[in-house]
Each structure stands twice: as C-alpha cells, then as structure tokens.
Amino acid sequence: MTKVNPHFAKKLQKFGAKTVFQCFSCGTCTAVCSLASDDQQFPRRFVRYVQLGLEDKINHSVEPWLCYYCGDCQKNCPRKADPGELMMALRRYLTSIYDWTGLSVRLYTSKVWEIISVIVLFLATLAVVYALHGPIVLDHTELETFAPRHIVDPAGWIFGGVLSIILLSNIYRMYRFIMGDQKVKIPASLYVQELATLIYHFATQRRFGLCKDNRRWIKHWLLMSGYAVAFILVNAFSKWFLTNEFLSIFHPVRLLGYYATIALLYVTTESIVSRLKKSEPIHQYSHSTDWMFLILLWLTAFTGLLVHVFKYLDLPLPTYYTFAIHLAFTVPLLALEVPFTKWAHLAYRPFALYFVRLRERALEIQRADGGLSSVEISG
C-alpha cells in the first residue's frame, strides 16, 4: 500500500520547490523534455507525486537524477510552475536522504548551519596551519619548508579517505533505495560488465549533450575536468606543487595546473554572472547551497592561482599566507560539497545511469530466458 505524506510539498519548499501547486498537469514539460522517455517520464509525473505526497515513491525513484535541467520545461511551462527547479529540489532532497549523517539536510534547509559550518571549517584549518607550519623563510620563497610534505600529504590522504568513505556509503544507500525492491534479479557479473557505463558517463558527462542547447555540456565538462585534473595533480604530483623549487611555467605539470585553474575560474565566473543576471532558465532561481558551492570553488581556484603567482615572483610572506587561506577555502569546499551537497551530484548522476543500465540488461537476460515480460524501470 502506497504511503502518503500530505506535508511533503511543504517539506520540499525548504529544498527550493516553491511553485509546485501552480502546475495543472498539462504535460507540456514532459512533452518538450529531450531527456524523458517512455520508461523514464518526467518532470510532470514527479510534480504530481509531490502534489499527492508520494514521498516513499520519490525516495525509491531514479528519474530525478536523469534530469539534467536543460531548461526547456522552464521556458515552455504555461503556468510558470518551474518544473526544472522542482526536479532540482528533488535532487537536493534525495541527497539528504542518502546521507546517513544528517548533515546534508541541515545544510540544505538551514542557512545558519551552512554559514556556521563554512566559518568553523575555515577557522579550524587556519588554526591547524598555524599550529603545524614549518619554519618561515623570508630570504626567498620555500613553500615546502613552510608546509612540510610529510605533514600535508598524509593529512590530505586521511581527509580524502574519510570523505570517500562517507560518499561511498551514501552511494550504497542510494543503491538500496533505488535497487532494493527489484522484480528482476541482477546477476553479479553485470555489475562488473556495466562498469564501462559508469566510467563513460562520469568522464564525459555526455547526457548533458542531449539537451537541445548543449553549451551547458561543454561548460559542465570543463568544470568537471578542471576539478579532476586539479585533484589528480594535488594528490599524485604534489612534489611538483608543494616544493621549494621553481618549475618552468612550461613544465607539463604546470600546464595542466593552468588548464585546471582557467577551467574552474571561467565556468564559476560565468555561472555567478548568469545567476546574478538570471539570464538562463536554470539560473533564475538559486538555492543558498548553489552560492556556497560557486563562491567556495571560485575562491579556492583564485587563491591557488595567487599562490603560484606569488611564488613565481618570489614573495615569501604573500605566498605562505595565501597558501594558508587557500587551504582554509579548500577544506570546507571538499568537506561540505563532496559528500553532502552540490558536488555529490557528480557521483550520483553517473551511478543512477549505471543502475538504470543494470536493470535494462537484467531484464533483457530474463526475457531471453523466458522470464518476466516487463518491468518498471523506475522502481
């Protein structure tokens, strides 16, 4: 028996869904959506789910992750019910129920929690740097002397390990919600065989390209690739970044670093300007966590660039101070965004497509064996 929560629509307002009852279920949004299909129909179906309070059905659905907010539904809705923003609010809500720590729901529904969390992590990072930094050399810039790699590297690995464990455990909870009540048994071998689907969609973000205006795919790929390159460089090639030596600006590692910085600064700056101007349908409404993500990412990339400039100019104190501030922005960005809010979408979206593909393949196998003739892909 389907459970109904009559207060669900009000609950979802805190996640950004403000106009759900303006929808009269005409279906225009689903008709113009280039990503909807016969098996995965949205946004209208989910607007209706919210109106009816079908919280449990939403909790076990994969479709909100298959929506990439192209913006066509926003532009064509005759009631201005903002169906794209509703799907965005559902993704925030689902992120909060996958998270077992309870921090995600607090960050999404309380600006006070959000701001205090950033401030506490920022100040705590500065305090740690103050307590553990090495000698301050003023004759010339010695960044590794100020921030010894034997401290920075293990701290980064532990920090990254903790965040990875939290995110992976949340992904497992996502799996349990979406795949827990299966009508088709999925062979264990399929999980390995379909890993290519997961890797492909994570690396290419190709589903963005299915939107009628695929410029967002290019921007999103630049953002994702810039972050991925920066992450790999910092973790695998730190000896070239956290060093007392002055590498040539044409060193391959430096060039990759420039690409990552330019990509991150370009996309975040463009997104901030677009949100301020409300120039695109997807930027007409901004949740506080959208701003937190963009501002922290921009400041992290910009201070990282300043560290490089000051070091290249051999300005010791500006280099050390800016490096400390850079870390102080990086920690809340990663600690809050990766497992709990906006950045988690980078994991949930490709995993959602992976889960859908697993269901499709399992159904094909069962049909070939004379089993079920159909299955509800959306769960």
Feature-to-residue mapping (PLM):
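Hydrophobic cores of alpha-helical transmembrane segments in multi-pass integral membrane proteins
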Residues: I116-Y130, A155-R173, Q193, T197, ...
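Helix-loop boundary elements of multi-pass alpha-helical membrane proteins
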Residues: R207-G209, K277-P281
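Iron-sulfur-cluster electron-transfer modules
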Residues: V20, S37, V47-K239, T243-F246
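Flexible metal-binding regulatory segments at protein termini and peripheral loops
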Residues: M1, R91, T95, G379
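Charge-dense polyanion-binding interfaces
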Residues: F250, A260, R361-G379
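Ferredoxin-type iron-sulfur electron-transfer modules and their immediate structural context
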Residues: M1-P64, L346, E360-L363, S373-I377
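Secondary-structure capping and boundary motifs in well-ordered enzyme cores
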Residues: Q22-S25, N59-V62, L66-Y69, Y258-T261, ...
